[in-house]
Amino acid sequence: MSNSNIDNDPAKIDSLLRKAKSKKIPVTYDDINKALPLNKNPSIRQLEEAILKFSDAGVDILESNEDDEIKLDIGIDEEFKLSTNVDNESEDEVEEENIGSTDDPVRLYLKDMGGVDLLTRENEVEIAKRIEEGRKTMTASLCRSPVAMRCFIVWYEDLVNEKMLLRDLIDLEANMLHDEVHENDEEHNSETEVEEHEDNHLSMSRVETQILHNIIDRMKKISFICEELLIEAKKCYEESFDPKVLQNSRKYNNNLELLIHEVSEIHFNSKRTEEILGKMYGINRDLINKETAFLKLAEKYGVTRQNFLDEYIGSVINAAWKEKMLKNKKVAWKELITKESDYIDQMINELSVIESNTGLLVNDFKKLVNTIQKSERQTLQAKKDMIEANLRLVISIAKKYANRGLQFLDLIQEGNIGLMKAVDKFEYRRGYKFSTYATWWIRQAITRAIADQARTIRIPVHMIETINKILRTSRQMLNELGYEPTATEIANRLSMPLDKVRKVMKIAKEPISLENPVGDDSDGGQLGDFIEDKNAVAPIDAAIQSNLREVTTRVLATLTPREERVLRMRFGIGMNTDHTLEEVGQQFKVTRERIRQIESKALRKLQHPIRSKKLNSFRNGGKRGDGNPSDLLEA
C-alpha cells in the first residue's frame, strides 16, 4: 500500500515509530491520530496506512491508553513532571502527551522545553565560559572605542555632580546579592519567602550608600585613564594617521589594559551598555547607508560589485584614494571619479567627520563594530542555551506558589525573568551548580511578583512586611493558645500599638468580587445581588411616587384647563422646573396680576374637602398619622 498520504507529515509518524520501537512499548490509535497532519482532518485511508506502517514494524497497537504508565517520554526528567493546571491537577496528567500535535500554548511550551537536554556540571561550565569570553571580548572592544571612553567620562561627571543615580549607572542588585547565594538545595518555605523577600528590596538604598564612594573612586580612575588614551590617540592620528603607530605604543597599550581591567570590575547597568552600543551601531548604520549609495552609483557607471569591493574595502577613502582611482586601468572607475567628483569629495568629508567623532579610521571602526556584534551574538546564544536547558527548574519552583494570587502562567513568566537574571550573574568559579544558583533568583522573582501584583489593591512594601509579621504571629499564637488571638493579645506579643495592629489587620483583608456566586447551584445568584444600593429608590417609595402622580393628575383634571396649566407651570408639576408669574404671563399673554388671581382661585378649589381628601394622605413626606404606607397606595 502506498504511503503517499503519510508522506505529507512523515516526521511525526517516524518519530512516534522510532520511540515505540526503541522503548518496545505499544501505541494507541489516539497516538497515531495525533501524529497525523494537524491542519487537515485525517481520512480513514490515511489512518489505515499509518496503522499498517506500525504493524509492519512490529509495534503493537492498543484500543486506548489503558495503562497510564505507557507513555512516550519526550525528554522531561522524572524529577520535573510538573503541573500545568493551577487547579491542582495531578502531576501525572501534566506529562507531555505522546508526541501528539496540539494548539494549547502550555503544552506546546512544555513540549519545546522537554526537547532540550539537561546540562551536566561540565556543560554548565562550558556555557558559562562562552558567556564570559563573549563579555570579555565585548568589554575589550568597547574600551578600544573613543565613543565609549567619552561616555565613561560623562558618566563620572554626572555621578559626581549628582545628575545620575548610582543605580542608573551600575547593577545594584548584582552588587547587593554578590555574596547572598549559598550552596544549599534544601526545601524552602515558599510562604515565608513571600513574607520576607522584601527585606532585600528595602536594603537597596542602604547598599547604594555603602558602595557609592568606592564606585566614584573607581569611575574617577576610569575617567582619568580615558582622558589619557584620548589625548594619545588624537596626537597619534594628527601626526601620522597610522593606526599601527598607536597599536605599537607601550604607554597606550598599558593604559588600555588597565582600563579594560577597571571596567570589567564594575557591573554596569545594562542600559549604560546599550547606550554605548546604540551610538556605535547608529554610526555604523550611517556608514553602511553611505557605502550602499556609493556602490549603487558606481554600478551605474559599469563598476561591478566585486571590483568595487576590491577597491573600496580596506582602503582609506581620502583625496589620495581619489587620485589613485583616476589612474585606474578600468574606464568605469575613471568615468565615475571624473563625473561624480563633487559627490566623492562630499563623501570624503562626511567620512572624515565620522573618523573625527569616533576617533578611529573608518575601516578600524567597522572592524571594531563587527567584533562587538560577533561577541554579542556569541553571548546571547550561550545565554539562550543555558536558559532553555533550565526552564524545567522554573516550573518546578513556580508550582509551589500556585493559588497565591497569580495565574500559573504568570508565575512561569516571572520565574523565567529571574532565570535570565541568574544567567547574567552566574559565576561558575564559585563552584556552585547553576541550578542551585538560579533557584534563589527564580524564587526572588516569583515572590516579588506575588507581593507586587497579587493584590487587587496594591499595598506598599513596608506595610506588606508588617502585615506578614502580624499574620505570622497570629498563626503562632493560634497553635499555642488553641483559639484565634485577639488584636490586643497580638499587640502585646509584638509590643506594637493596638490601633496599628487593628489598622493592619483591616488592611490585610482581601477584596472579594461582587460577581462571586452564592450557593452551590447556578440559581444562587451573585454576591452583589445581596448588597443594598443606597442610591437606588426603595420599591415602596417608587410606588408612592407613582401613585402621587396619578392622584395629582386626577385632581388637577377637575379644574379648568387654564387653571391646571397655570398650576403645573407655577409648581413645575410634570415639568423640568417651575416658572415665575412673569414667565407664565408671557405664555398666556396676560399680566402677572392676572396669573396670580388664576393661581389663587385654583388653589382655593383644591382646598375643597372633596379634592383635598385625596391629597391629604401624601402630606408630611408621604406618611399618615398611622404610618401605614398601604393607605397611600389606596388613595
UniProtKB/Swiss-Prot annotation:
Disulfide bonds: none
Compositionally biased region (Basic and acidic residues): 182-191
One GO term describing the cellular component: cytoplasm
Keyword Cytoplasm recorded: yes
Compartment(s) where it occurs, according to its Swiss-Prot or TrEMBL record: Cytoplasm
Residues within the DNA-binding region(s): 581-600
Primary subcellular site in the record, as a coarse category: cytoplasm
Superkingdom as given in the UniProt entry: Bacteria
Region (Sigma-70 factor domain-2): 386-456
Region (Sigma-70 factor domain-3) location: 465-542
Record bears the keyword Iron: no
Annotated stretches, region: Disordered: 182-202, 610-635
InterPro entries the UniProt entry points to: RNA_pol_sigma-70_dom, RNA_pol_sigma70, RNA_pol_sigma70_r1_2, RNA_pol_sigma70_r2, RNA_pol_sigma70_r3, RNA_pol_sigma70_r4, RNA_pol_sigma_70_non-ess, RNA_pol_sigma_70_r1_1
Keywords of the record: Cytoplasm, DNA-binding, Sigma factor, Transcription, Transcription regulation
GO molecular function terms listed in the Swiss-Prot or TrEMBL record: DNA binding; sigma factor activity
CDD domains in the record: Sigma70_r4
Gene Ontology terms describing biological process: DNA-templated transcription initiation
Region: Sigma-70 factor domain-4, residue numbers: 555-608
Family statement: Belongs to the sigma-70 factor family. RpoD/SigA subfamily.
Subunit relationships: Interacts transiently with the RNA polymerase catalytic core.
UniProt function note: Sigma factors are initiation factors that promote the attachment of RNA polymerase to specific initiation sites and are then released. This sigma factor is the primary sigma factor during exponential growth.
Protein name: RNA polymerase sigma factor RpoD
Primary gene name: rpoD
